[in-house]
């Protein structure tokens, strides 16, 4: 059985032709699905013999909503979603004046090992398929009965470690026949897999690339990001310049501020010199504290000083507004908390004895 959400329009048209059907049926079927009709029997202009073929060959794979947590602070909603194989992922809905934005996952867990991130603590379980990535938007959109207009690939997982499925997702999610979310409203965050940055640049998409930098030197970056042992900052910045030249799109550098690790004035000055002259923007992120490590967030004064120093170097800077702090809204925190709770309850009930 095939998940229809994994199919582009051209792929479904090709399947129709190969199976003795008119290609235009593919357009009709996807039109129904992206309008919210998931049952083949309810697709009124599809002949019954084709409906039967669809039932025998396809399904519309949507995850189950396990839990929804809503912030009392800002209305952010965190969704814990479950797939049929028992794996869990997280998606976060953020409401802004300009529309609804969703942060989605691209993998179950993560292999990158960044020291301050909860989603990587137990490693990568598996990649999400194209349809599983897409389905997060669909199931949340159905739940809130409102359109989602902005997408951030910044949840659990490294998008460029799931490159082919993510690229196909970007094609489908922005297509008129599907969710029709413009590429300029999509941000892809990566810790810096250099060869894939070049490949992505050659696609010449209109998405925003966000690069998780978090340090100005290779030695300091290696302390908190194992990926730095594979690719140096110099290699990453060279790839970023290539991306800028190919796409004419500004890059966002993400910088998680960790107290007494990378938040000093000298760090800010060095980062300013490093990025000076690039078509870029720096997003400062007060680190989310998790119990599995001792990293603490920087003080408000340190964050303000860091920002001011970058601005003095001609760098555009914003400090990320913290959302959903009362519901473990940082990537990986909710999934891990839920799994731990289930394990404790299982032990108490004797299921693991």
Swiss-Prot record:
* Enzyme Commission designation: 2.1.1.192
- Entry binding sites for [4Fe-4S] cluster: 110, 114, 117
Xref: InterPro entries: Aldolase_TIM, Methyltransferase_A, RlmN_N, RNA_MTrfase_RlmN, rRNA_lsu_MTrfase_RlmN/Cfr, rSAM
All copies of the Radical SAM core domain together span 96-326
Q: What cofactor is this protein dependent on?
A: [4Fe-4S] cluster
- Listed as disulfide-bonded, the cysteine pairs are 103-331
Primary localisation category: cytoplasm
**UniProt remark on cofactor binding:** Binds 1 [4Fe-4S] cluster. The cluster is coordinated with 3 cysteines and an exchangeable S-adenosyl-L-methionine.
Question: Which molecular-function annotations from GO does this UniProt entry contain?
Answer: 4 iron, 4 sulfur cluster binding; metal ion binding; rRNA (adenine(2503)-C2-)-methyltransferase activity; rRNA binding; tRNA (adenine(37)-C2)-methyltransferase activity; tRNA binding
**Which residues constitute the signal peptide according to the record?**
none
Q: What class of enzyme is it?
A: transferase
What else the UniProt entry mentions is: Reaction proceeds by a ping-pong mechanism involving intermediate methylation of a conserved cysteine residue.
What is the protein's name according to its record? Probable dual-specificity RNA methyltransferase RlmN
Its taxonomic path starts at: Bacteria, Bacillati, Bacillota, Clostridia, Eubacteriales
């Amino acid at each position: 059985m095939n998940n229809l959400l994994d199919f582009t329009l051209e792929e479904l048209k090709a399947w129709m032709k190969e199976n003795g059907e008119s290609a235009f049926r593919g357009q009709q079927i996807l039109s129904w699905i992206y309008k919210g009709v998931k049952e083949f029997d309810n697709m009124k202009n599809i002949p019954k013999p084709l409906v039967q073929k669809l039932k025998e060959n396809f399904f519309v794979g949507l995850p189950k909503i396990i839990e929804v947590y809503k912030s009392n602070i800002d209305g952010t909603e965190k969704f814990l979603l479950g797939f049929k194989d028992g794996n869990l992922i997280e998606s976060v809905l953020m409401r802004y004046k300009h529309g609804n934005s969703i942060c989605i996952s691209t993998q179950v867990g993560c292999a990158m090992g960044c020291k301050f991130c909860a989603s990587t603590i137990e490693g990568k379980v598996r990649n999400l398929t194209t349809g599983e990535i897409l389905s997060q938007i669909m199931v949340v959109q159905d739940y809130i009965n409102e359109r989602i207009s902005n997408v951030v690939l910044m949840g659990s997982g490294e998008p460029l470690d799931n490159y082919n499925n993510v690229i196909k997702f970007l094609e489908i999610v922005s297509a008129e026949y599907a969710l029709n979310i413009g590429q300029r409203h999509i941000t892809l965050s990566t810790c810096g897999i250099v060869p894939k940055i070049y490949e992505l640049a050659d696609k010449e998409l209109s998405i925003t690339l966000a690069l998780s930098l978090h340090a100005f030197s290779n030695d300091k970056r290696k302390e908190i990001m194992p990926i730095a042992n594979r690719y140096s900052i110099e290699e990453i910045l060279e790839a970023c310049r290539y991306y800028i030249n190919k796409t004419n799109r500004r890059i966002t550098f993400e910088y998680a501020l960790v107290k007494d690790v990378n938040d000093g004035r000298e760090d800010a000055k060095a980062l300013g010199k490093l990025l000076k002259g690039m078509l870029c923007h720096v997003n400062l992120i007060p680190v989310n504290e998790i119990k599995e490590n001792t990293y603490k967030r920087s003080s408000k004064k340190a964050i303000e000083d860091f920002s001011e120093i970058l601005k003095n170097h001609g760098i555009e800077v914003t400090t990320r507004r913290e959302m959903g702090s009362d519901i473990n809204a940082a990537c990986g925190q909710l999934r891990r908390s839920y799994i731990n709770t289930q394990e404790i309850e299982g032990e108490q009930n004797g299921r693991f004895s």
